[in-house]
Each structure stands twice: as structure tokens, then as C-alpha cells.
Amino acid sequence: MAYHKIPSLTADIFIFDDNLNFILIKRRNDPFKNCWALPGGFVEYGESVENAAIREAKEETSIDVELIDLVNVYSEPDRDPRGHTITVAYTAKGNFNDGKAEDDACDIAIFSAEKLDEIKIAFDHKKIIKDCLKIVKKNL
């Protein structure tokens, strides 16, 4: 049987409020250390992508989320410098007041769409955020 390299699978979560503000974490580790990013991370073996999204949101932000929409799958082979990583992005609601940086996050902050181009954002998360904002606005 031939050996096939398999991409890693991650989940990213766009946690938003009724004013279209959203939460980003500041990354504690490389790659993109000290850059802002969506909460998210690797899907564990035996775990659904949906459960990974909920778990990662809780681990990195202390926020319990309710997933709202599956936004898209992002699979460009070079989107992560660690190797080929495919991410599944979701929109989610949660109580911002519960937010606190944990795990791989060294900080957490609330941002508005108007500030998006001023922020140094990791990976392809700026594109993901823009896609999420389109879906959230459409569903208002």
C-alpha cells in the first residue's frame, strides 16, 4: 500500500455580537507569535470538527459558544507555514463578558469590521473574517 501525506485539520471560530464586533486572540506561540488570529486549533483524533470548534473557543477565550453557520473550508496548501492545513470556519455567538485569554492565547480583544485593515492578522484569517462578516450581515 502506498503512503499518502495527509493534511492537518483545524477549526476556526468567528465569535460575534449583535453589533458585528468580533473576538480575536493574540497568539502566544509561533507561527505568527503576537499576531491577532481567530480562536481555533487542531481537530483531535476521534473528535468532530464542530466539537473541536466549540472546545478551541472555550480553551482560548473561556467563552462557551453556540455555532451558528459553517462559513467555508479553506485549504490552500501554503496557508499555514507549518504545513498543509485545512480549516473549517464557523460563525458563533457567545458572551463577550466571559472572555479571558487562555491556552495558546496571550491576549484577547474585541474588534469591529472598521478596524480590520489596521490589525496584523495571522494566517489567512483576514480573508476568513471578511467571509464571516458577509454571511453574518446577510443573515441579519
Feature locations, PLM:
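Conserved N-terminal beta-strand and adjoining loop/helix that marks the start
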Residues: M1-F22, T91
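A generic structural micro-feature
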Residues: Y3-P7, C35, D80-I86
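Residues that flank catalytic or metal-binding motifs in active/ligand-binding sites
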Residues: L9-A11, I86-V88, D104
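Active-site-adjacent beta-strand/loop module that shapes the phosphate/pyrophosphate-binding cleft
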Residues: D17, S75-D98, C132, V136
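Conserved Nudix-box catalytic region and its N-terminal flanking loop in Nudix hydrolases
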Residues: N21-E59
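Hydrophobic pocket-lining residues within nucleotide cofactor-binding pockets
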Residues: V43, Y74, G94, A113-L116
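A short coil-to-beta-strand element that immediately follows conserved catalytic motifs
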Residues: I63-N72
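NUDIX/MutT-family hydrolases
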Residues: T91, K100-L133
